[in-house]
Amino acid sequence: MSGKGLSPAPFNAQPMIVQDADPLRFRVGEQDPKTREFAAFIGDHRYFAAAAAAAAAANPHPHLEFRQNFYSEKPIIGNPNDSGGSDGEDDVDVEEEDEDDDLDGNEGDIGMNKDAGEDSVSAGAVIVVGQDNAAYYSQHFKTVEASFVSRNEESSIAADNGCDFSGRRDLSSSSSNSIESLRTILSDPTTGSLMADAMILPCGHTFGAGGIEQVKQMKACCTCSQPVSEDSITPNLTLRVAVQAFCREENSQSNHPSKRKREGFDQERRAFGVTNHSGRSRNKSNHFPFAVADRVIIKGNKRTPPRFVGREAVVTTQCLNGWYVVKTLDNAESVKLQYRSLAKAPEDPSAKATPNKMVSNWL
């Protein structure tokens, strides 16, 4: 193509001013207002709790419109922290939100949930920025809903346990009530006494001795008025065994508190320095089976000198903790032994004829 017929056009336009276009590269739309309110990111947009509250107030039933607009189930595309402003402004907003989270904790989640209404708990996917600047989905709200359901189930289980009372009751009261109810079941419906000699009728009702006497007089069951003959009355062995086991358990429970009470009383007496007189007399009879001037035979033990073993002696002194000082009769040698090393000497008629003054010469 030749350039013979071309001529340059006159340039009459105003000169252009060239500026740096880097700040304009990310500036799309108007700048978001700087605020400390808790915000939620849905897609590429950021919504504030105040705007959500205003929308909820304008629409009294935001189940469909508000949920479709605000709680859109569209997943995150791109960077959820990009609010349409510059990078520097985003950093400032993040720092301000972090400081606000440090002061208020998790109040933003609660406030947003409360402003959005009670129905927002079961809403769709919602992206919420927390303290660590991370996105949370609707599982957070479903967890809250699940916790409420679990609490309701727990309360229903606690209430519906067959006895119409909560499981968190005092153990002593529950055990006493169970014992009383079991006693009522095992008691004669006519006399109220335990059916240790239970007899069963053909109709299936069981009575004790007193109830059976009334049944024989009436010739009919006291409960269902069905005719009964004396030959058809048979012993209820199973119920008799149950009554015997109940009586044993009741006796053991009645004995245990008294034993614990007695042991606690003894501990208190020992703590205050008061000894038990019955125990002291019993220990005294065990530790001091001999008296002064009693004739004993030295049995000895592994620490007793062999020359004393088997010799006859007489008790001269009674010491503490069951110890005695005895003196042999043949050579008047004294030794201190415990009561376990001594035995009562057999009765000897010749020893009775010996005058007491002969023994007192060397004592």
Swiss-Prot record:
Question: Which Pfam families is this protein grouped with?
Answer: PUB62-63_C (PF23112), U-box (PF04564)
UniProt superkingdom: Eukaryota
* EC number per UniProt: 2.3.2.27
Arranged from A to Z, the UniProt key words for this protein are: Transferase, Ubl conjugation pathway
What GO molecular function terms would the record report?
ubiquitin-protein transferase activity
> What's the source species for this entry?
Arabidopsis thaliana (Mouse-ear cress)
Q: Where is the composition biased (Acidic residues)?
A: 87-107
- Region annotated Disordered sits at 74-117, 343-363
Query: According to its UniProt entry, what is the function of this protein?
Result: Functions as an E3 ubiquitin ligase.
Looking at the record, the residues that make up the U-box domain are: 181-253
Q: State what protein this is by name.
A: U-box domain-containing protein 62
Give the catalytic activity. S-ubiquitinyl-[E2 ubiquitin-conjugating enzyme]-L-cysteine + [acceptor protein]-L-lysine = [E2 ubiquitin-conjugating enzyme]-L-cysteine + N(6)-ubiquitinyl-[acceptor protein]-L-lysine
Q: Does the keyword Transferase apply?
A: yes
| Top EC class of this enzyme | transferase
Question: Species lineage, top-down?
Answer: Eukaryota, Viridiplantae, Streptophyta, Embryophyta, Tracheophyta
GO annotations under biological process?
Answer: protein ubiquitination
Transferase recorded as keyword: yes
Pathway(s): Protein modification; protein ubiquitination
